[in-house]
Amino acid sequence: MSVALAGSPATNSAQYEPLRVMIVDDSVVIRGLISRWVEAEPDMVVAASLRTGLDAVNQLERVKPDVAVLDIEMPELDGISALPQLLAKKRDLVVIMASTLTRRNAEISFKALSLGAADYIPKPETTREPQAADIFKHDLLQKIRSLGGRVRRRAVPGVAAPAIAREPHPAPLPHPAVATPTVASQAALVKRSFGPTAPRVLLIGSSTGGPQALMSMVADIGPVIDRFPVLITQHMPPTFTTILAEHLARASRRPAHEGIEGEAIKPGNIYLAPGGKHMRVAKQGGNPVIALDDGPPVNFCKPAVDPLFMSAIEVWQGGILAVVLTGMGSDGMRGGKDIVAAGGSVIAQDEASSVVWGMPGAVANAGVCAAVLPLNQIGPKVVRLFAGDRS
């Protein structure tokens, strides 16, 4: 058994004590990489580096981690089997599932989310390719910091989570930091009136926590899907988006699939941006079609929300209703501003119901939202807006 432990935190720990990260992976290379990355961050420390899920379950109460990076495929006890045991022992443990990009692992990751995992991250096929390793590092550290900080903020009411949006180290692509409003300041956010034009298309952007939020929302908007097209960008890699589309189809009981280049956009369908490509909208013969873009990441994301939002204006002008759900970063803010400038409207998920209030917080803080609502109120509000309500 390969086990490395850090000292347990003091009972009278400071408010901004570094996040304690438990790394659980049977690959010594992956454990070593993640350990070095975490230890290089001033606001994190490696609480334990473990080889199996059984090690994690047995050591959990001793090492007291805030965040666990949990591999799926391990000997003795795999990640999906260890997950419920870990959460039974420590309900507020933030678990980030890590897996390679296979359909089986993607399906297991979705199951893990339903069992209480906070998020997932795809591991690169090889750590020898610098860009892949850099992206994995950037995404993992951001998830640890944002999700760990979110739990701490909930534990201390009225206290903003430390350093959620800051980027202390250079990233391979720019990813602007965004100040995250607290719940207390949310009531003071400036809200606009809904646009004068009745919406003709629904656009949705989401990231961390998005799969669960999307499945909840699409189950509430059946009447809208029946009469109007719905286009979604969820930050997610290939294979994962294929499975997410299947889940959305089941949740909504309507057709849902990854967008296809040149495909006509029609009412009655949910179109999901495929992993690894931006989904834009274009006109062909005067009709809206899907346009896939294999260009560089936008806002450090591919697919990104902004390309969808901004391209849709060329087709529907002010007849757009955009919804920004839970997620890290600020993707969707620039596109949201452009939608409002064109006469459309934007709704953001509120902080209390978001896993991470980065993306929705960014659009809300930018003053472009007509409403900032709990997740369970967004679907019904969308139905009313498409039925003609402009209030």
Swiss-Prot record:
Location within or outside the cell: Cytoplasm
Stored Pfam families: CheB_methylest, Response_reg
Post-translational modification: Phosphorylated by CheA. Phosphorylation of the N-terminal regulatory domain activates the methylesterase activity.
InterPro entries xref list: CheB-like, CheB_C, CheY-like_superfamily, Sig_transdc_resp-reg_Me-estase, Sig_transdc_resp-reg_receiver
EC class name: hydrolase
Modified positions (4-aspartylphosphate) in chain numbering: 71
CheB-type methylesterase domain sequence ranges: 196-383
Residue positions of the active site: 207, 235, 331
The organism's place on the tree of life at top rank: Bacteria
EC number, as in UniProt: 3.1.1.61, 3.5.1.44
GO molecular function, one term: protein-glutamate methylesterase activity
GO CC annotations on file: cytoplasm
Keywords noted in UniProt: Chemotaxis, Cytoplasm, Hydrolase, Phosphoprotein
Catalytic function, reaction form: [protein]-L-glutamate 5-O-methyl ester + H2O = L-glutamyl-[protein] + methanol + H(+); L-glutaminyl-[protein] + H2O = L-glutamyl-[protein] + NH4(+)
Function: Involved in chemotaxis. Part of a chemotaxis signal transduction system that modulates chemotaxis in response to various stimuli. Catalyzes the demethylation of specific methylglutamate residues introduced into the chemoreceptors (methyl-accepting chemotaxis proteins or MCP) by CheR. Also mediates the irreversible deamidation of specific glutamine residues to glutamic acid.
PANTHER family in alphabetical order: PROTEIN-GLUTAMATE METHYLESTERASE/PROTEIN-GLUTAMINE GLUTAMINASE (PTHR42872), PROTEIN-GLUTAMATE METHYLESTERASE_PROTEIN-GLUTAMINE GLUTAMINASE 1 (PTHR42872:SF3)
Note: R.palustris does not have a group 1 operon.
Family: Belongs to the CheB family.
NCBIfam families found in the cross-reference section: PRK00742.1 (NF001965)
Protein name, as recorded: Protein-glutamate methylesterase/protein-glutamine glutaminase of group 2 operon
Organism this protein belongs to: Rhodopseudomonas palustris (strain ATCC BAA-98 / CGA009)
Gene name per UniProt: cheB2
